[in-house]
Amino acid sequence: GFQPSVDALVAQATSEQRVLDAATITGALGNIHSSAGVDLHFWLDPTNYAAFVEAVGTTLASVDPANAATYRSNVAAFVADLVALDTAYATGLKTCTSRTMVTGHQAFGYLAARYGLTQVGIAGVNPEQEPSAKDLAAVAETVRSAGVHTIYTETLVEPKFAQTVASSTGATLAVLDPVEGITDASPGKDYLEVMRANLAALRKGQECS
């Protein structure tokens, strides 16, 4: 993952440079655990992301007081966008017929918890962790028993296991983006656009009125 590169940058920091450990912020948000590990995708809950942005803004203002007003203004504007996004999700997913979302891997736990959905991941928290035949059979049984009609793949993850479950159950495939990086394949140019595209995909896939 990205951690070795992050560790290298931290090691190169000079005494004049301040390093903010994001884990001190995200840890306070409450980690989502599963048997497969810890879900680090806290930003998929817009309220978590807002808390993170505010904490980072406060730190930047303290180390660069000359530009504190700019930091505060930018933070306030982005947090307002995140509040609106949270409202759109809460409203848009309130009436979904299906409350079980089957995903390529367990990246959407924060989103599911925030909006009253149950996430079932084909792979674990690490998308490179390949599911066994037993795992695939268990997910397929959940798809059938829960009446799931849509299985979500991801822009940066090989969809072959999702395709296997879909072909055995008759479910269709749709794309959800965990916003791990913006690429040409992303359904938007920034976090807000990608999250709005995710909401549209969820409303269709979860059969929301």
Listing of model-derived features with the role each one plays in the protein:
Residues 1-209:
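Extracytoplasmic metal-acquisition and chelation regions
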